Each structure stands twice: as structure tokens, then as C-alpha cells.
Amino acid sequence: HYPLRRQRQMCIRDSIRADYRGHTVWECPPNGQGVTALLLLRMMERFDLETLSDRDRIHVLAEAAKLAYHLRDTYLADPSFSPVPVEWLLADEQVDGFVAMISRDKATEYAPSDFPDHPHTVYLAAVDEDGMAVSLINSIFDDFGSGISTPEYGVLFHSRGKAFRLEADHPNAIEGGKRPLHTIIPGMLSQDDRLVGPFGVMGGQYQAVGHAMLLSNMFNLGMNPQQALDAPRSFAHAGVLQLEDSHGAEMAGILSGLGHEVDFPSSPIGGGQAIIRDAANGVLVAGSDPRKDGHASGY
């Protein structure tokens, strides 16, 4: 039996980062999946996304996501127990090799991730008049989490132990005192050591893809935060390419022709919030996803 009293101290680790389109993207380190979002951005940077058709952008993101999530499920775990090769995954040579594995005209099959799904995440972003910013995300994984709460305050404990693996030799294997791989990743942007703004995406496993899609919409396609959040979404997950209804049946047919198994989910894909500082005038521009409760407001 592992003594729970040993877990009363929080673990504070340095953020990880990568550059994308002139901005520095800051993400949560392992045992979080922030490196998955950074890897996706590093791969997408190798494509001229501005000139690609909608079909090709959806396809490239789907193929990059399948590979990035496969690498996530292979390597990510609590670094206190198993070293996680963050620098190796994000190195130019490795990223070039990963991109070379992406076919531009054919869907590649990967074993579907067996990471458990969970939709119950809340995200908020705030920036004050002094330029201090908060990017906050919270989730207890399931309804009422583990079902266990603190007797003094009624705070529920999460049930993220579901994300452990049962293979004894896997980096994310279940073990006492160990933190499981998790999906919740609040993001932050800077440029030339100045704050650009906080951003985040809800939606369980979608979050890493959501980060990449949100930033690509803004920095490749020139959208403002609200437009970038409103834009139609796709997500290659569990062997299926999910498309929101707004993509339409014609696009689904085109992508099916590339070998994707396409599905229109019954509910929207994810949600998000973002606050971005306009570099030209310093004005803060916010966006709030209409797929979820929330709104953008100034004070």
C-alpha cells in the first residue's frame, strides 16, 4: 500500500516550448501531453498551409495527429519514473523524419489509441492591466471524479489513474506514487520575451490537436481569435476521422477517397478560449468558443 500522505506536495516543473510562426508556444511538460501539441506544430510548420486546399489541410493535420498521438502513447509518462525524450521528439532531424512518414494522398493506419476518453474539462484565460496572464484548466476526468472527496471541504479527487497502462514494462505503467499521462494542457504564447496571450482548448484527447488547429488558424490563415475558434474542426481519433457537420458531405466523400474512415460526431468537437495581444497597438483581443458555455469580456 502506498501512503497517500506522501502525495501532499504538489509537483512544479518548468514549461516546455517550441517556436511557431514567429511566436513561442509554451506548454505543460510531461506527464502532460503538451509535447504532443508542440510536435504537431513542428510538423505542420514543414507544410505551406496557407496554399493548401481545405482537403489537404484536414488530411495533413489528421496524418500528423495520428503519428503524434502514437508517439505520445509510446513515450509519455511521469518523468520522475521514466525519462521522457522531449528534446529528441522536437529536434529538427526527428521532426523531418516524422514528416517524411506522412503521405499527401493516402491515409496511414495506426493502431487506435486506447487512452480513455473524457469530455469533462473547464478552461479559462485572463489578462490584467499590468500584462499578467493566467491560463487555467481543470478536470477531474469523470463525473464526480473518483467519487472520493476531502471530508473538510468536499473537494473531489480526480480519477486520472484510468490513464495508466497495465503493461509492466510500459513507461506509463501503473505504480504507487506515480502520476499518469494526462491530457489537460493550458497554453501560453510569447513573442520576443513579451506576452502575447493565454489560450486553451477543452475536449479530452482533442486538446493537443485543438492547440495546433487554433494556432494554425491564427498564424497561418490570418484569423482573429474568435474566427480561429469558430472555424470547422476535424479530429483523427480511434481509427476514425471525425468531421464537424459544417465540413459537409462533399468534403467527407473526398477524404474517404484518401482512405479515411469519416464520421460526423453527434456533438461538437472540443471548445476553447483565447486572449491575444495585438502587437501593433497592444490591444487585447479575446475569443470564446460558441460550442461551450463561456464568453469574452473586458473590464
Predicted feature locations:
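Short Gly/Pro-enriched turn/cap motifs at secondary-structure boundaries
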Residues: 28-31, 113-117, 175-181, 263-267
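Active-site rim segments in enzyme catalytic domains, especially the processed small/beta chain
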Residues: 132-197, 221, 225
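Single conserved hydrophobic/aromatic residue that forms the stacking wall/gate
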Residues: 1-12
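Internal maturation/activation junctions in enzymes
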Residues: 47-140, 152-153, 160, 266
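Extended C-terminal subregions enriched in glycine
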Residues: 58, 130, 178, 211, ...
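Extended C-terminal regions of large enzymes
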Residues: 27-30, 35, 189-205, 218
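Short Pro/Gly-enriched beta-strand edge/turn motifs at strand-loop
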Residues: 103-112, 165-174, 257-258
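Short, small/polar residue-rich loop motifs at catalytic or cofactor-binding pockets
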Residues: 118-121, 182-184, 271
